[in-house]
């Protein structure tokens, strides 16, 4: 019999909602009540419904324009505002170039052309996990993958227990579709896991096969790889490119898919040590537990989250002049560096994926500014951050000195 006097049509509709949830990874809400019968809970379901899509920003078009107008009046860019230590970075010290990389990563990719992956390889104890915990997770949704054998292909992608579509258990990647994934201690992963990531990182989707089933699932996620150099690495006999051996058998394929790669033993530099120690002691003293401090930090995080969701939907347009400037800066300045040749052209004389990533980087900076068009300032920022990223592949300089123009 149909519970609660529901018709067969309403029951069928509820079952369809549950089936679509299993297929697409959407969240469902269930309303009803339960009674205790013989020490067991018996649930009586009233309604089954698809929950609201939380990827949609609550910021309206007029609110966005008012905010951008205020920034223009005060002669401050939105990106500069979100990089202030008093806003989103109260609990973590980082040089500006790393802050920019994190803000780019926090955009929500809408399709494979928006994907922006970052690699950060540094020495132990540099606070990479703290970066995710104190900056990224409070700001935007991010899935954190396990390290070593705790991270499995089934856990990342999903698994099928039979030949029926309803038996699919979705993994972390499809659950975080249009969001982000952080990989902590990636150097402990089995190389086979990296191999399975190739299609996801490039195309934002993956295929699963079992029995007679061959299905495709979305996995449009920005990825950040945080890890340490391989055991064999040392300052005396290796250069920074050797750090990338942490990616194992698929090093060159992963490199081709990473928009930005930072490889250095220090992400901050010696002058920052005192500031980092100050942050540690402030946290231990409970500074960030103060109600007023927490209220202000939460305000910035909520506003930043809605702003990032809103601007992620912008499709910045490129004029003919801008297209020419992107081409010239890429071919004349980015591609002609020694680091680019060593990292990306060892296996092939062409890597069109890097050109696509550079163009996407220009568009991403436009989004962070809330701009409907790509301007020369966005190209300049994209060029600078990519040059700094590649410079760390060849030279062991701290990021704050690199960002200041050290050559």
Q: For each predicted feature, which ranges?
A:
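N-terminal secretory signal sequences
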Residues: 1-16, 27-29, 328, 332, ...
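Active-site-adjacent bridging/hinge elements
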Residues: 3-7, 72-81, 197, 322-338
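Conserved ASCE/P-loop NTPase catalytic core
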Residues: 1, 78-309
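A cross-taxa feature marking solvent-exposed loop/turn segments within ectodomains of secreted
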Residues: 37-39, 113, 372
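Charged/polar, low-hydrophobicity segments characteristic of intrinsically disordered regions
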Residues: 126-140, 387-407
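Structured beta-strand/turn binding interfaces of compact recognition modules in eukaryotic regulators
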Residues: 31-33, 184, 226, 377
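Basic, amphipathic alpha-helical bundle interface domains used for macromolecular binding and assembly
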Residues: 234-236, 244, 253-255, 261, ...
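OB-fold and OB-like single-stranded nucleic-acid-recognition modules
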Residues: 1-79, 191-192
């Amino acid at each position: 019999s149909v519970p609660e006097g529901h018709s067969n049509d309403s029951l069928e509709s509820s079952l369809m909602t549950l089936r679509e949830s299993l297929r697409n990874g959407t969240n469902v809400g269930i309303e009803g009540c339960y009674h205790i019968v013989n020490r067991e809970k018996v649930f009586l379901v009233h309604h089954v419904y698809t929950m609201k899509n939380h990827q949609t920003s609550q910021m309206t078009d007029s609110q966005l324009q008012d905010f951008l107008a205020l920034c223009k009046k005060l002669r401050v860019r939105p990106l500069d505002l979100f990089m202030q230590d008093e806003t989103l970075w109260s609990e973590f010290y980082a040089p500006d170039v790393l802050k920019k990389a994190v803000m780019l990563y926090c955009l929500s990719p809408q399709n494979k052309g928006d994907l922006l992956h970052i690699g950060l390889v540094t020495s132990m104890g540099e606070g990479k996990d703290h970066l995710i915990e104190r900056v990224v997770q409070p700001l935007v949704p991010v899935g954190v993958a396990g390290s070593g054998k705790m991270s499995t292909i089934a856990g990342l992608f999903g698994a099928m227990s039979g030949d029926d579509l309803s038996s699919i258990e979705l993994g972390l990647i499809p659950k975080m579709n249009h969001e982000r994934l952080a990989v902590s201690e990636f150097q402990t992963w089995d190389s086979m896991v990296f191999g399975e990531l190739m299609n996801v990182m490039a195309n934002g989707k993956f295929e699963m096969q079992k029995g007679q089933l061959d299905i495709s699932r979305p996995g449009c996620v920005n990825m950040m790889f945080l890890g340490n150099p391989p055991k064999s690495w040392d300052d005396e006999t290796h250069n920074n490119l050797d750090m990338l051996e942490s990616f194992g058998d698929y090093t060159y394929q992963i490199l081709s898919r990473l928009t930005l790669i930072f490889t250095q033993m220090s992400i901050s530099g010696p002058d920052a040590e005192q500031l980092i120690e100050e942050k540690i002691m402030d946290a231990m003293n409970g500074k960030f537990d103060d109600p007023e401090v927490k209220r202000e930090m939460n305000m910035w995080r909520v506003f930043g989250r809605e702003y990032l969701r809103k601007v992620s939907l912008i499709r910045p347009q490129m004029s003919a002049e801008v297209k020419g400037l992107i081409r010239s800066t890429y071919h004349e300045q980015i591609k002609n560096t020694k680091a680019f040749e060593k990292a990306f052209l060892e296996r092939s004389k062409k890597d069109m994926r890097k050109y696509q990533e550079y163009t996407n980087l220009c568009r991403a900076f436009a989004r962070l500014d809330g701009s409907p068009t790509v301007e020369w300032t966005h190209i300049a920022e994209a060029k600078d951050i990519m040059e700094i990223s590649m410079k760390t592949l060849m030279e062991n300089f701290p990021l704050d000195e690199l960002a200041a123009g050290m050559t």
